[in-house]
Structures are given as C-alpha cells and as structure tokens.
Amino acid sequence: MFCPFCSIQETKVIDSRLVADGHQVRRRRECTMCKERFTTFEMAELVMPRVVKRDGSREPFNEDKLRAGLQRALEKRPVSTEQVEQCISRLKSAMRATGEREITSEYLGNLIMDALKELDKVAYVRFASVYRSFEDIREFGEEIARLGD
C-alpha cells in the first residue's frame, strides 16, 4: 500500500484487529521510509442482489431507499439509529444469504416486515399498511389482531 505522506509503496502492518462486528479489519500501518503511521480499514465488497419489482422491472438494491422506508415507519418511535443500522445490516445479510442474483420486491417487503415486527410493532403496522395497501380500518384491525397471535 502506498504511504499517504510520502507516496512510497513500502509500508508494514503493525497492528490488525476486527471491528464493526467482525465485518471490517482495522490495520495500523507504518511507512518504512518516512516512519509516519496511518490507519486503513478493509471490508469485503459484497454484491447485493437486484430487486425485481411487481411490474417486472429490475433495479439495483438501494440501501438508502431501505433506510428511508424504515425511518418513515419508525418515525417518532423509541428506536435508536444504531438499532436501525443493525436492522439494515441483518436485512442485507439475509438478502445475500439467499445466494440469488435477483430477489423479488415481495420477498424484500416480507423480510422488512419480519424485521419490523421484532423491532417495533407500531412501525410494523405502519409499514404493512402501506406495503399491503390497506383500504379501510378493518384491514388495520385484522393486522393488529394477527400481531396478538
């Protein structure tokens, strides 16, 4: 790796440790020429499956879209940003674990609803009402009754 201070290619690793729940490696490096030290982070670049929409169109997985949907459902709920990020991480892991190049938006929606059911039941009902296009109060009641089961 090139030294960011003197641009020479000779650096050595003086310390390595796992961070971010084992998903990243933090390395402390030292330049053999100028002796400056710097930190690098390494993580696997994993390809996310494409999402097949209900109309048959395909689009790349968009983490920002997922985050926005979760935050909308969780608005004014007692759920921390850290919990949301952990939820996103688990959802992405579940998507990759399918081993598929493409997943349906229906499958993704069901994954999200399962995650929200565990995280916050009110947010789950909010998300389900939009995702399942509830038409009237009866459908809300039925979904809430299913939560009690």
UniProtKB/Swiss-Prot annotation:
Keyword Transcription regulation appears in the UniProt entry: yes
Molecular-function annotations in GO: ATP binding; DNA binding; zinc ion binding
Superkingdom classification of source: Bacteria
Cystine connections: none
Domain ATP-cone, chain residue ranges per copy: 49-139
Cofactors (names): Zn(2+)
Entry keywords, A to Z: ATP-binding, DNA-binding, Metal-binding, Nucleotide-binding, Repressor, Transcription, Transcription regulation, Zinc, Zinc-finger
InterPro entries attached to this UniProt entry: ATP-cone_dom, NrdR-like_N, RNR_NrdR-like
Family note: Belongs to the NrdR family.
Alphabetized HAMAP family for the sequence: NrdR
Functional summary from the UniProt entry: Negatively regulates transcription of bacterial ribonucleotide reductase nrd genes and operons by binding to NrdR-boxes.
Family matches, as PANTHER family: TRANSCRIPTIONAL REPRESSOR NRDR
Record-given protein name: Transcriptional repressor NrdR
Source taxonomy: Bacteria, Pseudomonadati, Pseudomonadota, Gammaproteobacteria, Alteromonadales
